[in-house]
Amino acid sequence: MISSCSDNVEGVNGSNENQTGSTEYTASVGFDWATSRNVSVSVSSPKTTVVSIYSDKDCSEATLLVGDLLVSSTTTFLELNIPIHCETLYLKYNSVSGKKTMPIALNTNTRNEVVAAIVPEDCVQPTSEEDAGFRFYHNTGVAMFEDTWPNESGNDNDMNDVVFEYDLKVTECQKEDLLPAQGYKEGLLMTLDVRAKGGRYPTKLGVVLGGLDKKYIKETTVRIVLKGGQGTEQELATGTDMAEVREVNGQVQYCKVTIDTKGDSPIVILDGLSDLGDNTNFFQVTPGYVEEGRPMLRAEIKLTGVNRSDAGVTKAESDAQLAAYRELITDTKKQNFFIVTHDNKEIHMKGYKPTYSYTNYDTDSKGLMMDNVPYCNKNGFVWGIKVPVGIAHASEKVLFSTAYPKFKEWVESDGAKNKDWYLHCLLYTSPSPRD
């Protein structure tokens, strides 16, 4: 289904007849493609209370940055990663008259800044110790890839050869006295939802969780589910470090999810993209062949940290583990998303190294990439991008810069202009619903 989210649809018909084979855009060597930025927030309160901070005034689950944060008159300092267009954060707290929201203004011209927030006087204390026991950090977004690396995609640069939604939640104990009995709750919960596949070649998608040493992982759990709307799901398979399914509701559908801890950082891989759609209309990208509301194939990964109160765990080790998990959210550069094609090529985003198992990068790249900048050619062209909001993906054969008309100027201005380009779509395929 073709949808418009702009009043101006003149000349947009889903074809590229007027396009040439020339480079769609030219990016500078130093452009980092960042769609998010870091802010430091200090939070204090006249009395002990629990708050949550969001990146949008609707305070939806998708815009949650940190939840159930216990604050008091002693200032709590946070490092948060927010969408780059964000001008205001929103602090939600409980008051005597119910839930309230307080805006926190930001400086949009600064990548790294410090802002202070003081919870209003009408806040109330948490109702139980359990309510104040754990905080969690949250990060979500959409990853989109082209499968033509090391060649540019030309007139087919629609960034929809693989599209998946990602969601990461890190839980940590914020009351030391709860750690001995409740420390097993600390860790990472991550979901990867396969939204669309518009390419013939992709077979797998994955992510390297950079900086998370395997010594900080005590237990792993894998689930494969079908994720519907309003929180509905159908469990298909479970396991510890691997889960596999070969049939879904009577239809052939191979899917295997693994957690690989053989390298320096854990690697999560979902294999099974080959069974999605066909080689004519593909999967959820071609107008007229998009099934609205179709449940998405989901990989759910849970990594449980070592209980930091266990005997033999030093304070330095405890702090290092806490930082390693938290930084998966607050330093999103540690999220190394990628896809794998039928000939075993790995395609990552700009600047990210391939995994330890892909040893043919130098040969396969054919000398077309920038020196010392993996997966970025000498025109600045890239094959993957992630956006920290739930944007739609482009329809098949619609140039990404046509679907998102502010995108090209954002790239060619080194990110100085149109920071909110991903909020302004012209032609796209509607995404499946998510919570």
Features from the language model and the residues they span:
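Structured interaction patches on ligand/partner-binding surfaces of diverse proteins
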Residues: 16-22, 67-71, 96-121, 164
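Short, well-ordered beta-strand segments enriched in hydrophobic/aromatic residues
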Residues: 166, 186-196
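Short, acidic Ser/Thr/Gly-rich low-complexity loop/linker segments typical of extracellular
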Residues: 60-76
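Short Pro-Gly-centered beta-turn/loop motif in secreted/extracellular proteins
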Residues: 72-90
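Short, ordered, surface-exposed loop/turn motifs in non-cytosolic proteins
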Residues: 37, 45-64, 159, 204
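Conserved small/polar residues in nucleotide/adenosyl-binding loops
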Residues: 428-435
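Short helix/strand-capping turn motifs
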Residues: 101, 115-137, 141-151, 197-254, ...
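Bacterial Sec-dependent N-terminal signal peptides
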Residues: 2-26, 31
